Amino acid sequence: MTRIVFMGTPDFSVPVLGTLIDDGYEVVGVVTQPDRPKGRKKVMTPPPVKEEALRRGIPVLQPEKVREEAETDKILALEPDLIVTAAFGQILPKKLLDYPKYGCINVHASLLPELRGGAPIHYAILEGKEKTGVTIMYMVEKLDAGDMLAKVEVDIEETDNVGTLHDKLSKAGAALLSETVPRIIDGSVTPEKQDEQKATYAPNIKREQELIDWSKPGEVLYNQVRGLNPWPVAYTVLNGQTLKVWAAKKCQALKQAEPGEIVTVEKDGIVVATGNDTALKLTEVQPAGKKRMKAEDFVRGAGLQAGMKLGHDDEK
């Protein structure tokens, strides 16, 4: 029986691990990131993959740095025939990449060579793409640059956010892996080199990308809001306080106004002027120190009115 070591960390990886187990492979170990403090109370929380592995009775390793020789040797001691990774979060050393007879493969949430890196789901929406997908490829020492083994496309609906698209891609990745692993083992898979000229990148989201720049067109800001939901969430500033924007709708500007100016306050949202004489309706927000709420509930308590401005020149 093929011995597999699985390496992954967040929710995206859980269905991928489950598929390997359900397909009858001998998953001899799971490698994931260490437990991390989470939430306001900083409670030490295990990664979702660790919880799933323990539930399934599979041994778990949690190296701080997998590239340290002692940690690498622990994984090699499991004698894997194949290593499968999905959103693991660390680069593997050559010693590990070279060991398994069937190689090391990665389940990546984009149509490579587009959107290499740690945040491909975010960038697919931020860039306004209408489709993305999952690629399974051999791992090499360069980030997401190995030969491709299989791909599947996934449509991006206009109402998708990172959360909904994440779930679609996770399921698609698990199904694609189920089809691909047998072909790797029997040698029928045909690797395809990536075109480096077409490579684009999706590095981890930075704090400055979360800030809404109201001078940009409404379409761009709509993609920003859904491309940062449920994490890390786009924000603006109102009266010197952070206001997170969880959800919005595209809408027409009823009159010309300065970008960031509240044009109208309606029952179902706050219409804000954006660049190029466009507008965005904020439908779900979160004031500093409070829970997220429907815009109509926020409006009731905040005394918002047309003509007020969101955002300041000094917001950084």
Curated annotation (Swiss-Prot):
One GO cellular component term: cytosol
Known catalytic reactions: L-methionyl-tRNA(fMet) + (6R)-10-formyltetrahydrofolate = N-formyl-L-methionyl-tRNA(fMet) + (6S)-5,6,7,8-tetrahydrofolate + H(+)
Pfam families: Formyl_trans_C, Formyl_trans_N
Source species, domain of life: Bacteria
Gene Ontology molecular function, alphabetical: methionyl-tRNA formyltransferase activity
EC number: 2.1.2.9
SUPFAM superfamilies named among the record's database cross-references: FMT C-terminal domain-like, Formyltransferase
Residues noted as binding (6S)-5,6,7,8-tetrahydrofolate in the record, renumbered to the chain: S110, L111, L112, P113
PROSITE patterns, A to Z: GART
CDD domains recorded: FMT_core_Met-tRNA-FMT_N, Met_tRNA_FMT_C
Keyword annotations: Protein biosynthesis, Transferase
Role of this protein: Attaches a formyl group to the free amino group of methionyl-tRNA(fMet). The formyl group appears to play a dual role in the initiator identity of N-formylmethionyl-tRNA by promoting its recognition by IF2 and preventing the misappropriation of this tRNA by the elongation apparatus.
PANTHER family the UniProt entry points to: METHIONYL-TRNA FORMYLTRANSFERASE, METHIONYL-TRNA FORMYLTRANSFERASE, MITOCHONDRIAL
Protein family per UniProt: Belongs to the Fmt family.
Name the record gives this protein: Methionyl-tRNA formyltransferase
Organism this protein belongs to: Bacillus licheniformis (strain ATCC 14580 / DSM 13 / JCM 2505 / CCUG 7422 / NBRC 12200 / NCIMB 9375 / NCTC 10341 / NRRL NRS-1264 / Gibson 46)
Gene: fmt
